[in-house]
Amino acid sequence: MAMAMAMPSSSPPLFFSLLNLMLLLLLLAPYCSAVSVPNNNTHHRSSSPTQTTLQQLHSPDSPPPPPLPTPTVTTPTPPPPPPAPRPPRRHHRIPPPPPPLLPTPPPPPASISPTPAPPLPPPPAPAPPPTPTPKFPSSSANPSPPDAYPFTNYPFFPNFAAPPPPTQQQQQQPSGDGGLPTFPANISTLVHPTQRPPRRFPVLQALLLSFLSLCLLLLSALLSLHLFRRLRHRHHSHSHPNARSPSSRSGATNHHHDDDGDGDEEGRRLKPPPMPTSSSNPSTEFLYLGTLAAPPQQPPPTTSHLRPGSPELRPLPPLPRVGPPSGEFASRSSASDPSTAPPAAAEASSSSLSPSSPSASSPTLGSSPVHLRPPSIPQPRGRAPNPSPPKRRPQPPEPMAAHAWNPFVPMPPQAPPSEEEEEHSPSEKSMRKSRPLHSDKLKPGSLHMKDEMIHLYLNNSMAAAMPREVCLLGAPRCHGIGMLVGALGISKEQVREAILEGNAHGLGVEALRMLMQMVLTNEEELKLKYFKDDLSTKLCPVEAFLKAVLDIPFAFKRMDAMLYVANFYLEVNQLRMSYATLEAACQELKNSRLFHKVLEAVLNFGNLMSIDTGSPNSHAMEPNTLLKIVDVKGADGKAALLQFVVHEIVKPEGHSPVCKTNANTTQQYDVEYRKHGLQVVSKLAAELSNTKKASSIDMMKLSRDVSELGVGLGKIHDVLRLNSMVTSADSARRFHNTMSMFLRQAEEEILKLQAQESICLSCVKEVTEYFHGELSSGDEGHMARVFGSVREFLAMLDRICKEAGEEMKSSGWMMGRDWNMAAPMGMTTP
């Protein structure tokens, strides 16, 4: 029995080797049988000439046969000496009856030549009847009749003398005469066998056996792999007892860990040992779970419901003591030598007897020897065992005496712990690392809950008492105002403080504009003002912000006044800069010598061309007329009037004092004069820069802005009048002081701005009358058109100067006196 139980742990390698060897032999057997099986037709054909030759050699009456057609044999070898005479052997075999011979004409003698037979063609579908071979003459004149059983009456080796070897002449003589050597008469009835198709059964059998052998080999390999993994898993589970479930660890204390521990465990699982016949004589070689604890003795329960072969009644073998005393019981043979036990058993025994172990704490298991632990259920593969916290190892008891193995004898008291064991505190023993729990994989902040949520779920009365938010203005309105409040980034306390003090610069222009977008209607203001918070309802955060603002008297009127204050100085500065630009443009047009010279030259050429150059009272040509003669071309169709004017002005402007000192001849420095004059003319656009800026200013808009600033001062006076009626003197006084100071400064700035406006208008009017003459009452709004015309003329002059500079580099100058001007717009020249 022990050998059979130990076989699964030790025999698998040998068993697998034998199984693989047998399968390999089965795999090679078909090939060996296919090689060893001969062909019946070939053997029959090859054996007939051999037997015939041997009979010819040992026959005394027959001559030797002709030589075989083999090219390698040239001369016949002498025959071996004859053997000793032996009695003839007769075969007592009853041969089958010969087939009936049909009388057919003999074939011609030419077919009996010694030449080798040609290869046989494949047999036709209908097999022809067998043709008997011709009867050749024997050594005597009269041939003897053929015998029905030629191979039975004559021995295989007759006792006759060997004939002499045939000569070359005899071999060359043709056969057919009576004296020539021929085949013996006893084989004259041989019939050449007909060719049959080869049989394919051995090849198919070999392939079939090979396929079956390969399937068996694969099946055995899979079985070997399965058994190997199973044994490895079992060995791993025994070597790591901490990975088991608590029930498996508690049951591991009753297993016998020795060399054949795996085999014993498998044997006990397959077949439990028989039950003891009586409990009066308990065996001392088995360990019962009742000895692990000493509960109060109770009457044994009935065991009529338990079968003898039940696993609950299976006794457990003694367990060895491992390492230091660990509180487990072992056999007497292994208790004296604790070093013989493997360390794996020590870990299993130390982790099994824990305070939470069910086998050690159940009082019903130790009441009777028949109550035994059921077999441990193995954990299913692929599922991790249930984790458990680290167990505390109990203090080991003293070694038990021989009589203590009786389950009915009480255990002696345990000895006090030693000093070495006291050094290891329970906290240090419990520091052993255990398997991580599923809760350890959670993030630290995932279990965090707010205090409000805890109160909401734990105290329902508190949650019921919380006020409910209401929205008086409606969800869309509150959403829009909430976006503005969020964009402000200012608390309602800061807004209230700035409005009460009138600090416009503290909030800023953007914040005041956003607050002005929250202006409410009278109905909405009344709803928010007369709403009172209670325990059941409260306003939403947006409406609470608006209510805090509306608590200030005339809040939105104050914000409007503060927005005017924040924008006042910015608008005043812009108006001052615009008026200053207009005044500078007027001064540039009056004081620019080069501009007047260009205008005078254009006026002279215009008069020569009979072009209306403006009103008769004007001192210069209108800017609009300058734009008309820009595209007038000369006789060659290339040079324009403005180009000729520029060329004529460039030469006198180029005679600077620096150039005159170095001018010895006019022809040498003529190009330099023109180049210098071109630079002077091209600077005209830079001298009239304010004129270009003034062309984009709308004087009518400037007048409206000054008027609006004066109207804004009236709003400030209205807010101060309303603020004086507020009962709260402190808040009203602060706002009144701030606004009163601003009013005094704003009135002074507006007066200065109005004076500057009048001066600017007079200058613009004077420049306009210089070009256009006296203006009527309806043309006062179009006085700034002169700046736009001058800007366009300067742009064309700048373009012509650039073209002249490029021509100077590429070719010579075209003189004005060589030009023939064409009359533009259908007019003729004088």
Swiss-Prot record:
The chain crosses the membrane at residues 203-223. GO terms for molecular function: actin filament binding. It is found in: Membrane. Residues 40-195, 235-446 are annotated as: Disordered. GO terms for biological process: actin cytoskeleton organization; actin nucleation. One of its GO terms (cellular component) is membrane. It comes from Oryza sativa subsp. japonica (Rice). The keyword Transmembrane helix applies. Keywords: Membrane, Signal, Transmembrane, Transmembrane helix. This is Formin-like protein 14. Residues 1-34 form the signal peptide. Residues 40-59 have a biased composition (Polar residues). Belongs to the formin-like family. Class-I subfamily. The keyword Transport does not apply. Residues 61-86, 95-135, 314-323 have a biased composition (Pro residues). Residues 149-160, 324-369 have a biased composition (Low complexity). It holds the Pfam family FH2. Residues 390-823 form the FH2 domain. It is a single-pass membrane protein. Residues 424-446 have a biased composition (Basic and acidic residues).
